[in-house]
Amino acid sequence: MTNPIIPRVGIATDAHQIEAGKPCWIACLLFEGVDGCEGHSDGDVVAHAIVDALLSASGLGDLGSFVGVGRPEYDGVSGTQLLKEVRELLSAHGYVIGNVAAQLVGQTPKFGPRREEAQQVISEIIGAPCSLSATTTDHMGFTGRSEGRASVATAVVWKA
């Protein structure tokens, strides 16, 4: 009798303050004419939340332990690069990515017109389905006041 494949689920949140003049990277896409988010990296809250959820699901730590803020080689690193590296890390530990889902929380950018493009880009990077959505908080809180953006993500992985 073989052991059943048991999926592992991870969840994560990421948030960054908006920084005037910084390029806006969301879900591995550049949004022209919109201020981006501050951070040690590119400030892509969606990519970062997905990376963190994948690490959570696999039990391999979290975003802070994965890249840290004191490592100069990650200064300005893109969400795309982080997703590639976490996929390689999971694979090296025998994990397969089942799927990921993430939601962007913020007033800007208008995400709907590029949602499918972002899903395709992230799916290609991680080698698994990706579902994305976006919402506002009806002008409540730091995201509602356009002081920052946040993202919540879930990921499903299993041992190969």
Curated annotation (Swiss-Prot):
Cross-referenced Pfam families: YgbB (PF02542)
Biological process annotations from GO: isopentenyl diphosphate biosynthetic process, methylerythritol 4-phosphate pathway; terpenoid biosynthetic process
Signal sequence interval, chain numbering: none
Manner of cofactor binding, per the entry note: Binds 1 divalent metal cation per subunit.
GO molecular function: 2-C-methyl-D-erythritol 2,4-cyclodiphosphate synthase activity; metal ion binding
Site (Transition state stabilizer): 40, 136
Listed cofactors: a divalent metal cation
Binding-site residues, 4-CDP-2-C-methyl-D-erythritol 2-phosphate: 14-16, 40-41, 62-64, 135-138, 142, 145
Keywords (A to Z) from UniProt: Isoprene biosynthesis, Lyase, Metal-binding
Reaction catalyzed: 4-CDP-2-C-methyl-D-erythritol 2-phosphate = 2-C-methyl-D-erythritol 2,4-cyclic diphosphate + CMP
Protein name as annotated: 2-C-methyl-D-erythritol 2,4-cyclodiphosphate synthase
